[in-house]
Design a protein with these regions (language model features):
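Solvent-exposed residues in well-ordered beta-strands and their adjoining turns
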Residues: 9-11, 53-55, 81, 104-106
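Tryptophan-anchored aromatic micro-motifs
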Residues: 1-14, 87-89
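Short secondary-structure capping micro-motifs at structural edges
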Residues: 24-28, 37-38
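Short, compositionally biased strand/turn segments
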Residues: 14-25
Length: 108
């Protein structure tokens, strides 16, 4: 995974969302208007493995969490395709609920 700034689009059966992530030295940091995203990534062969958590920073009830809770930890596996990375995984708190994310690199 290239270091840099990514836009992220994520999907569950409950809805979709988006935000930004910055990848550097194995760390992921970012968020959107309602939540911060804090995690780590490693490369294992052709796959990228991610563990990332959400933390609500905006108490406005208009910002609804996709998983129904303000704090969640996701475990994801992904593959690169040029400037994009496709991830699939689940939340530790809801292991049966599929999660998909597409990261697209938008800058250094």
């Amino acid at each position: 995974m290239q270091e840099g700034l990514y836009k992220v689009e994520f999907h569950t059966v409950h809805g979709t969302g988006n935000g930004v992530l910055y990848a550097t030295s194995g760390k992921l940091r970012g968020g959107n208007s309602g939540f911060a995203f804090i995690g780590n990534y490693t490369r294992k062969g052709d796959e990228i493995h991610v563990k990332i958590s959400t933390l609500r920073h905006n108490l406005d009830p208009g910002f609804k969490p996709l998983f129904g809770t303000d704090m969640i930890t996701l475990t994801l596996k992904g593959t690169e395709n040029g400037d994009m990375v496709d991830f699939e995984g689940t939340a530790l708190q809801m292991p049966g609920l599929a999660f998909r994310a597409v990261l697209t690199r938008i800058g250094d």
